[in-house]
C-alpha cells in the first residue's frame, strides 16, 4: 500500500491511499457491505453510479455464511462480488460480542455462539487473519478487545494490554505468512482502544504505533457517549498516530461527526447510518434530515435535494419516493440508499477540495449554516 499526504489545513488532511485494486482519495467514507453486499445495491450501483473506491465487508458474517473458504474458492471478495476495487474487512470481534448471547474473551481470543445456528466458535488473532487471507481484502483489521462504555479503569487497562498483545501476535503472524507468499497484497491495521480515558488512549496508541502496521484505527467510540466526548477523545488521540499512515475512525457516523473528525485529523470512516436510515425513511440532504414518509411529500414534485446531482435526485421526485416507501416497494430502498451514500461521498469530496484550498474552516462554517437556514 502506498500512502501520500497531498494537502493539510491545520489538522485536516487530504491524502491518497493506493492498494492493488484502487486509488482512494481521502477523506473517504466507506459504505458498509456486511455480507459482501451493501444492502439494496449491486456492484454497478457502487462502482459506476456512486463511483466508490472502497467498501467494507464483515469478517464475522462471511466466516459464518457462506464461509471464508467458499469465498476463497470463488475468487475472494473481488471475484465473488464482481466489485474490483478495494475492500476493507473488520476483524469480526465486535459482532462476536454484540450478536452472540454467549460470548467471552480470554487471553487467547473471543469465544462466541453463532447468531445463525448457535454453533460455538473461537476467534484468535491468527484465526481472524486466516479468514481475511481467504477473503482477500485489501485492508485487514486485527482482533482487538472491545469495551462497552462506561467501563472501569481495571477493564480499560485489561482491554489495552490485551489489544497490544493481540497486535503483537497479529503483526508477527502476518510477517510470517507474507514470507510464505500469503497476504502479500493485503495490508493490516491495528485498533487503538482505551475508551474515553486519555491515559489509556495514549498508552494504547504509543504501544501499537511502535509496531509495523500499515495503518491505525480508533475503535471503541460512538457507543453512546456524548458527541463532545467523542470529538475530544479523537482530538486527543490523533497526534499520537503516525502522520505517514492512514487514520481510520471506526463506526462513525453522522455527517456532523465526519465534518468534526476530519477537522481533528481522521482520514477514513465507515458507518451503516446512510443506508440504514435510508431504509427507515430518513434522507440526508444539504439542509439537514428529511423524513420522506411524511404526508406533506405526497404531492411534492421536487427532487429530494435541489443541490444534489445523484441518480435519484436527477430522475425522481419526493412524491415518488414517498409513494414507494409507503407501498413498501423494494425500489425505494435502492433509490434512497443511492441518494444517502451519494450525499456522504460528496461531502467527503467537498471536504477534500476545501482542505486542498486551505479553506476547511470556511467549509465547516458553511456546512452548519446550510443546516440552520
From Swiss-Prot:
Mind naming one GO cellular-component term on file for this protein? Answer: cytosol
Single Gene Ontology BP annotation? tRNA-guanine transglycosylation
The entry's free-text remark on the cofactor is: Binds 1 zinc ion per subunit.
Any one GO MF annotation of this record = metal ion binding
Q: List, separated by semicolons, the cofactors it needs.
A: Zn(2+)
Kindly give the Gene3D superfamilies that the UniProt entry links to this protein: Queuine tRNA-ribosyltransferase-like
Coiled-coil segments on the chain, per record: none
Name the record gives this protein: Queuine tRNA-ribosyltransferase
The scientific name of the source species is Nitratiruptor sp. (strain SB155-2)
Lineage runs:
Bacteria, Pseudomonadati, Campylobacterota, Epsilonproteobacteria, Nautiliales
